[in-house]
Amino acid sequence: MARQSKKKGRPVSGWIILDKPKGMRSTEAVSQIKYLFHAQKVGHAGTLDPLASGLLPIALGEATKTVPYVMQGTKTYRFHIAWGEERSTDDLEGEITHTSSKRPTREEILALLPQYTGVILQTPPQFSAIKIAGNRAYDLAREGEVVEIPPRQVEIETFKLIEMITKDHSIFEITCGKGTYVRSLARDMGRDLGCYAHIADLRRIAVAPFCENDLITWDELKAVELDKSAKNEKDAPFERNFIKLDELLIETISALECLSHYTLSQTQAQQVMKGNTVLLYHHDVPLDEDEVCVLYQDQLLAIGALEKNQFKPKRLFTI
């Protein structure tokens, strides 16, 4: 019988809400967090373009099981639009493809915003991760191929003009649903206003349920990594302070604010951990609910469904 290989790394769980700097790819950020925490498993909840900065939720260990719930959450972006130029990538990185001397007025911009609020059809940028016949659109675009990307529905809850910095630059803030491309918004608004446009700066400031108050920078992480106080002897080979690093993690359950929470007794918890169904007899428990989570001693135990007051576990968590 073949021996199972031991997983490399520590079984550490929780969320790091990284303030991703410009120039770093989301996958690179995940790799660095995995190395820094010497974690067995790490993933992120929503790609952020290399030229964008801001909130990148990174899940470690058991928290990776909650990534889909964060992916479905609303996102808030603050961004600068540069008027007068359209670019191949719809941001500063691309080549200039169209120019205009026209500049929109504040009144023209405000009159346009309602058209970009609510459920709208949006065509993703040529340089995007959308798959076309099995290939990433950005790979085809880099080869000089112009691909036809079908428009898709996205939802924009709020769209605000924050400031007109100059006649060439305006600052906006949006809260939107999954799959919205801010670069496409700039491109389309520029065309509608007859002046062309692209994104000059983009920062994500929230991914529900996480916000700017949860952010931690690379500098802060590195400072904790090098802190020699309260270091565990087992950490010595890594020259990292895992005790202090682990204190920075946000609890796994924090990603599940969108679900109802119910507390189990010890007997119920034991049954759920075996994959068995248990009856929830709390007075406030609904008869049926598609997804809820259950806890034991304030620790996340499982996600599952309620059917006739019975909890059926679908996903278990190690506590």
Swiss-Prot record:
Keywords: Isomerase, tRNA processing. SUPFAM superfamilies: Pseudouridine synthase. GO terms for molecular function: RNA binding; tRNA pseudouridine(55) synthase activity. InterPro entries: PsdUridine_synth_cat_dom_sf, PsdUridine_synth_N, tRNA_psdUridine_synth_TruB, TruB_C. Its EC number is 5.4.99.25. It is an enzyme of class 5 (isomerase). It catalyses: uridine(55) in tRNA = pseudouridine(55) in tRNA. Pfam families: TruB_C_2, TruB_N. It comes from the Bacteria. GO terms for biological process: mRNA pseudouridine synthesis; tRNA pseudouridine synthesis. The active site is at D49 (nucleophile). CDD domains: PseudoU_synth_EcTruB (cd02573). Belongs to the pseudouridine synthase TruB family. Type 1 subfamily. Responsible for synthesis of pseudouridine from uracil-55 in the psi GC loop of transfer RNAs. PANTHER family: PSEUDOURIDYLATE SYNTHASE TRUB1 (PTHR13767:SF2), TRNA-PSEUDOURIDINE SYNTHASE (PTHR13767). This is tRNA pseudouridine synthase B. It comes from Bartonella henselae (strain ATCC 49882 / DSM 28221 / CCUG 30454 / Houston 1). The lineage of its organism: Bacteria, Pseudomonadati, Pseudomonadota, Alphaproteobacteria, Hyphomicrobiales. The gene is truB.
